[in-house]
C-alpha cells in the first residue's frame, strides 16, 4: 500500500517509514500540510489516480495548516472510501474524541502507540476502501 505520512517529527517519520516499509508498504513523507495537499491535488487531471492509498496525519504541525485543516480540505475534496485517513496524535483523549465525532470515518490513534495497533488500523482502513 502507498501511504502518505504527514508528521513533523523527524524521529517519528523515520520510525514509521522503516516499520511500515518492513511490512511491505511504500511511505511518502511530508512535514507540512501544504506539501501533502500538493501531492494529492496539485495540477492533476481528474482521471489521474491519487498517489496514496491512505494517509496518516499528525494533528500538531508547523506552518499555516494544522492537521485538522488538512483533514477538512481532504474531506471536502474526497469521500472516505477514496482516501482513508488515520490520525496519529499526542492530543489529549478528549480532543481526539471530539474530532472523532466530527470525522466518524477517520481512525484515531493516540501517541504513544504500539506498532501493532497502527498496522491493524492500516489493514482495517484498507479493507474498508475495497
Could you tell me what each predicted segment is?
Residues 50-53, 78-84:
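His-Asp phosphorelay/catalytic-motif detector in bacterial-type signaling
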Residues 66-81:
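Short amphipathic alpha-helix used as the core "switch/output" element in two-component signaling
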Residues 87-89:
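Hydrophobic/aromatic residues positioned on beta-strands within the core alpha/beta folds
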Residues 10-35, 103-106:
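Two-component/phosphorelay signaling modules centered on CheY-like receiver
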Residues 113-123:
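C-terminal output helix
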Residues 29-54, 59:
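Acidic, metal-coordinating helix/loop segments flanking the phosphotransfer/catalytic sites
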Residues 7:
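Conserved acidic carboxylate
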Residues 109-110:
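Residues at the ends of beta-strands that form strand-to-helix hinge/output surfaces
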Amino acid at each position: 500500500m502507498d501511504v502518505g505520512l504527514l508528521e513533523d517529527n523527524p524521529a517519528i517519520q523515520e520510525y514509521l517509514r522503516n516499520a511500515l516499509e518492513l511490512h511491505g508498504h511504500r511511505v511518502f513523507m511530508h512535514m507540512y500540510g501544504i506539501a501533502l495537499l500538493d501531492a494529492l491535488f496539485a495540477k492533476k487531471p481528474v482521471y489521474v489516480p491519487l498517489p496514496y492509498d491512505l494517509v496518516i496525519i499528525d494533528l500538531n504541525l508547523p506552518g499555516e495548516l494544522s492537521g485538522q485543516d488538512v483533514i477538512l480540505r481532504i474531506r471536502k475534496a474526497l469521500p472516505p472510501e477514496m482516501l482513508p485517513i488515520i490520525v496519529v496524535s499526542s492530543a489529549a483523549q478528549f480532543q481526539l474524541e471530539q474530532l472523532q465525532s466530527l470525522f466518524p470515518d477517520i481512525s484515531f490513534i493516540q501517541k504513544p502507540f504500539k506498532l501493532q495497533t497502527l498496522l491493524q488500523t492500516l489493514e482495517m482502513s484498507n479493507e474498508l476502501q475495497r
